Amino acid sequence: MGKKKSLFYQFQSSINDSESGHKKFVDKHSQKSQTEQESQPWRIYSFSAKSNLLDTAHNFSGYLKEQYGISKVKEISSDMCQSWLDHCAKSGLSLSSLECYRSNLKKLSHVVNRHFGLHTDFSTTVKHELVIDKTSPREFALSKEEIEMVKSSIVKPCNSSNYFLFSSFCATRINSVEKLMCRDLTFGKDYAVTVRILDDKGGRDRTITVQDKEFYKLCRSLVSNKNPDSLLFGGIKKDSANRWLNRRLHRLGVTVKSQTIGGKAIFKRGNHSVRKFAIQEYCQKQYNLYLEQGLSPDAAKSQAEKDACIRLGHGSEGRSDIIKIYLSAGS
C-alpha cells in the first residue's frame, strides 16, 4: 500500500512538475515573444520564484492541517485560502508580505490544477483593515536630501545642531561624544580629521578618521577659541539633542509613509536616523574604494561591512546582524 502523501508534498510535487522545470528556467518575456502564445500561468520562471512558492506552500499547508484537518489539495476551498491570509494579516505580517502570499496562492492554484487536472481557485483579497500598522520611525534613516534640508535650516548654530552635523559624517552616538574634548581632535593633511573616542560602548577606546573638506571646516569651527580641555559640544545630552532634531524634522515635514492603506504618515525622529544615514554613506564609500583596488564585489562588500561595524563602535568582529539593521534601514 502506497505511503500517504502530505499536503505539502502534493504542493511540492506540483511545483517540481512545472513544465519549465527548475533546471532550465526561461525568460518570461522572451517566452511570450518567441512562441507568440498566451502566457501559461503555471510556469515558474526562476529559482527565486520557486523558493518563494515552496515557502508559501509550506506555511499554508501547516495552517490547513491545523485548522481544517484536510489532506488533499482538491479539498482546499477559496474560503480556506482567505481565512489563512486573514490570519497572516492579524498575526502582524506587512502589507508587502501579504501581497506576496496572495500572488503565490494564485500561482499555486494554477500549478496544482495543471498537475492534478483540477479546477481549484485560490484567489484571495488582502483586507487592509486587518493589517497592523507597524510603521516606526526607528526603522528608517534620513535620506541625503533630508540631511541637506536640516543643514539648510540651521540659522543659529547650537550644541545640538553642531552634533547633528558632526554625526552626519562620523555616525557617532550622543553618549560617545558627551565627554569629547577639543584635544581629542587631530587635524591632518588633505582635510583629514581624526577623532579620538575614549571609553566608548563596551569600554573600547577608538579613533575615527574622516577626510572631507566640509567636516574639516566644521571641526575647525568647533575648536576655535576654546581651550584643549573644553568640551566639544558643551556637555550635550541625548534628550536635548533629539528634541532639537525632532522639532526641526517636524517643521520641515520629514515623514515616513505608513505601511498600511489609509494609515497616517509618521514624522521621522531621533539622531539614530542620522547615524544610519552616515553609516550607509560610509559603507558605500568603502565598497567603491575596495572595488577600485581590485576586490571582487563580494569581497568588497564583506570588507566594507567590517569597516562599517568598526565605525559604529561595535569592534572588528564583523557583526553582520547589527550591520544588516543599519544598512537595510530605508529612507
Please report, for each region that a protein language model flagged, where it lies by residue.
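N-terminal DNA-binding module of tyrosine recombinases/phage integrases
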Residues: M1-A49
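N-terminal core-binding DNA-recognition domain of tyrosine recombinases/integrases
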Residues: K28-S136
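Short, basic/aromatic-rich helical patch in the C-terminal catalytic core of site-specific tyrosine
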Residues: L105, V177, N271-E292, A308-C309
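DNA breakage-rejoining catalytic core of tyrosine-based enzymes
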Residues: V131-M149, G202-E214, N227-P228
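Basic, Lys/Arg- and aromatic-enriched nucleic-acid-binding interface segment
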Residues: K144-I174
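Conserved tyrosine-mediated DNA breakage-rejoining catalytic core shared by Y-recombinases
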Residues: K179-L218
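Short, polar N-cap/turn motifs at the start of nucleic acid-interacting alpha helices
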Residues: F187, N288-L327
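Active-site/catalytic core of tyrosine-dependent DNA strand-transfer enzymes
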Residues: Q211-K285
